[in-house]
Design a protein with these regions (language model features):
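Positively charged n-region of N-terminal signal peptides that target proteins for export
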Residues: 1-4
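C-terminal motif of bacterial Sec signal peptides marking the signal peptidase cleavage site
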Residues: 13-16
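Bacterial signal peptide processing site
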Residues: 18-20
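Acidic/His-rich structured neighborhood in mature extracellular/periplasmic domains
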Residues: 57-204, 208-213, 221-236, 249
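Outer-membrane beta-barrel translocator/channel fold
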Residues: 238-243
Length: 284
């Protein structure tokens, strides 16, 4: 009986310790939980703008801000979150968003990740006109040709950066990463250690083996977090996400785009400015 009582007491102790540890773990997790805003409130947009203006040209940030405001107003804040909250992958009412946009903007399809990233960085990074194949940028070209977002010379630099480049026929992402490093090194992306262009690079072999920046955004350092700025697609909203570390942002992006591959191509990979980012997730 005494042994049973001792055993019972130990079990209670173990369970209570487990609950306590779980509680501590939950508290620690909550401290680093990512939060997201669509910048549809004045407060959140001001917060993001102030962060960006620490590192980027004021006129570029102002132009970006006007694009955010125009998009959010056009879709009447449908499905948008003003304040930062833990839901970083929300569901959007795309049918309503598309109807509102088309009814007010007509044939202008709006802007995407590449256009908004370039707007923010265009007067901070370098410029180099190199031969390009912008076949995969048909929608980007339509958006830029039907707006005054970029000047003719800025368009040329945009196409030079984001058009697809040739690579080798291999599934080795490191080979492709080196090719992309060589390409992006032309544009002086490392102009400030506290802000960077982060890209998701896709390997395609439909016409020939090539690399294409399928998604891109800007990552800025704050005192206790990193702020990630992205426009998901032409139709989808802007998102500003706070991550505890750079690695959290990189993993979020890889997890989102990891299936953009085929049996004959490499998995997507992440670039920070002109450097390949190594992730354990590549091995899975």
């Amino acid at each position: 009986m005494k042994k049973i009582l001792i055993l019972f007491t130990c079990l209670i102790f173990l369970v209570s310790c487990g609950n306590k540890n779980d509680a501590v773990k939950d508290i620690a997790t909550n401290k680093t939980e990512p939060t997201m805003s669509n910048m549809s409130s004045k407060e959140s947009l001001v917060e993001v703008t102030e962060t960006l203006k620490k590192y980027l040209k004021e006129e570029d940030v102002d132009q970006f801000t006007s694009l955010v405001e125009d998009y959010n107003e056009t879709i009447e804040n449908t499905s948008l979150h003003g304040d930062f909250n833990p839901e970083i992958n929300p569901e959007y009412d795309f049918e309503k968003i598309d109807k509102l946009w088309t009814s007010k903007k007509g044939e202008f399809i709006g802007t995407n990740c590449r256009i908004n990233t370039f707007v923010l960085l265009k007067n901070s990074i370098g410029s180099k006109n190199i031969p390009y194949d912008n076949e995969d940028l048909a929608f980007d070209m339509s958006a830029l040709d039907n707006s005054k977002i970029l000047s003719d010379s800025e368009k040329e630099n945009f196409y030079s950066i984001f058009s697809k480049i040739k690579t080798e026929k291999t599934k080795d992402y490191k080979v492709h990463g080196k090719k992309m490093e060589e390409h992006l090194s032309n544009f002086n992306l490392n102009f400030n250690k506290d802000i960077s262009m982060v890209s998701v690079v896709i390997h395609d072999d439909l016409d020939y083996d090539s690399l294409f920046i399928g998604h891109v955004g800007v990552l800025a350092k704050e005192e206790d977090h990193y702020l990630w700025i992205e426009k998901i697609s032409f139709q989808e909203p802007y998102q500003a996400i706070k991550f505890a570390t750079k690695e959290d942002c990189f993993k979020y992006l890889y997890d989102k785009y990891k299936d953009y591959k085929s049996e004959t191509t490499s998995h997507p990979f992440i670039m920070e400015n002109d450097k390949l980012v190594e992730l354990d997730e590549y091995k899975n």
